[in-house]
Amino acid sequence: LYDPEKSVHYLNLASTVAGLEDAIPVTSQLYELLKQQNIQLPVLADLRKLPYTKATEIYEYMYDQYWKKCTHRLLISLPPQRGFVRDLAVASGAAIVWLDARDWKENTVLRKFMKTMQPGESIITGWYAEERSGIGLATEYGLSTIPSDFYENTTVYAGMQQQIQYPEIPKMPALENKIYLALYMSDGDNVQYCQHAMSELWDKKGRGVIPINWTISPGLVDFGPGLLNHYYTTATPNDFFASGPSGMGYSLIYDAHNYLWNATSGTDFTPYAKLTQQYLEKSGLRVITIWDEVNQEQMGAYVRNCRYLYGLTQQDWERRPYKVPTYIQDHKLAFVPNLPCYANGVDVIYSFWRDTIAKFDGSHPIFLSAQGESWKMGPDNIVALKKRLEELSPGNIVICRGDHFFNLHNQANYLPFNLTLLPKMKITSSPTSTETKFAAD
């Protein structure tokens, strides 16, 4: 029993207790209605007796009395008034909190929960009062976040047991002295975007005409394998999927807006990189988009622990005194800047690329990458963008899938690349139960 009039945060406490006690959270009014219908249920916890009115007090009480009983593999960050993803918390015995990392008192309580979770095993789901402060605080403790505060029917989608049906990998084009461009659609780390807005973009005219790189959450392997299979089985050869930032769950290693490193050590970053590799294997994803940047120690952690990767992009928000360069880590793995990195339309991408493309002299291949804000662009806009770019350098524009982009980049720079993707490469094998076409991946 709880009283939302005393504080709405009692609903989160009641939901948490309900998950642990196999009970239901009920207000006084609803309790009376149940009794009127002769539904006599025992009261396992009467939270109305508690004297607390502040969020910090209520979640301190939750931490002291119930956190040790909760699973520490999952923490739900969710406004009390919101029902989405709450079913997952109750089903899994997870705690539900709503604390603002910008408020130092609430920040202190939130840290109590996070510091007792396990990097590389635990994740946070839901969302935060403010993006960068919340994601940044979780990153500080080696934790990543699956944005899901509007994800519907979580336990239904997560309860599906499905073998992931990986899309076939087409051959990449032959390397020439041309302009290779990769265009990424943002926000795929957000599983409710994958459930709703992405499906609307997916059905728009123009998809499949030219290569588009769709960011998607590797966490859908657990959160919604049916959703992942929907996109994989309806994809064209021009649809490529990349992991949203910055691997298994949203992690903000360097916050370029606030000039703040939330994590600096490659060693501390390793559990996240190892967790990411597990989900790259399960989801079949081989490119990651990073928000915002990582240092070279952390690049090394990706190289050592994420052996499936072809490459990664970083976000150049132009908040440095220099442009973010392309890094090649350990003579193997490329970290390429997205510039622009969160364009609010194709006109922005065109303006960033125009001069470089217009000055192209054909002496060697060049590689440019950009990420567009999914809410403000779609396949039809990208098709129109290609036509405009071709006018700047006729016959030289090659828009690429992400896997092709990084393999062509490595081939051009005499770095390791996947030979099976070469257009004239033929793959044969001795008798096997696996089709040889899968050797390309």
Predicted feature locations:
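Short, solvent-exposed loop/linker segments at the N-terminal edge
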Residues: 429-440
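Acidic (Asp/Glu)-rich catalytic clusters
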Residues: 173-175, 200-207, 223-246, 280, ...
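Preference for solvent-exposed, low-hydrophobicity sequence contexts
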Residues: 1-158
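A structural signal for short, well-ordered beta-strand segments and their strand-loop junctions
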Residues: 122-127, 215, 242-244, 289-291, ...
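A recurrent domain-boundary module in secreted/ectodomain proteins
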Residues: 145-167, 402-426
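Active-site beta->alpha N-cap acidic-glycine motif
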Residues: 152-232
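Catalytic grooves of carbohydrate-active enzymes
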Residues: 117, 186-209, 219, 283-422
